[in-house]
């Protein structure tokens, strides 16, 4: 877009229309004309938790990657566990009420760093651009630094978290490499390692809130999105549903179910259930609960995700029973607090 040149810059009357604005200063009107998503972190305020409500402390076993709230994964390195707590309705020093995520090291004395991350999906247009990360935090861990990993390597910015267990606001920059590929993971670590590289002490913790990644070299106010907007952004990577979709029996023990995703997923997802089994899955109207497995198969998109629309695909459900080929049905998960899982996360 060409820059707009005006004779009276920075003066836009409250009743201005687009024609009037065309005579204004470009830097003033550009944010209005080009408004869009600012925060490339998804669920930076921890409202979306499709896997369950983790308001109670969750024990994360050693060397085990766990996602509690959407898009945030933690993995304790070393021989001990860490505790993840999802705190709701906290109040920050500026008076804003929000949620926070807290990671606390257990009795582990050989864990050299925190590994709580969000992987932001990269795109080519990010090449050579500068992004700013900002968030609120509190910690008791001395000499703690954050970290990021781009498509080339991992780096610790020259900033340190204040270990006084009070809330502080911090921002730091990510200068992207000159050639950023599509679909790679840009890892954001709000806290990572002590400057000395010493192991974490037992009881060391990091708690953080309102995480933002935005284009440019200045941290601006947090971008608030509606719950529905945030959920749809999270759906690109992970979805849970109690109704999978309708379809037809392709054979006596094989049901083809057509899945229509609310948004295009990052790639063809892996299907599973919350329980890990299939005994709570029913194909109406049979009420047999005899599903033995499921996978994304016949007729589904398998191409490059930067040109393919992974929003419609076929799931084949196998059964131990028999039904007439050509009959229709609806695949549902309707007992024991179970649900379908579609996973296409980074």
Regions found by a protein language model. Name each.
Residues 1-19:
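Extracellular "spike/adhesin" assembly and maturation modules
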Residues 3-4, 20-346:
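Extracellular and organelle-lumenal recognition/adhesion modules and their flexible linkers in secreted
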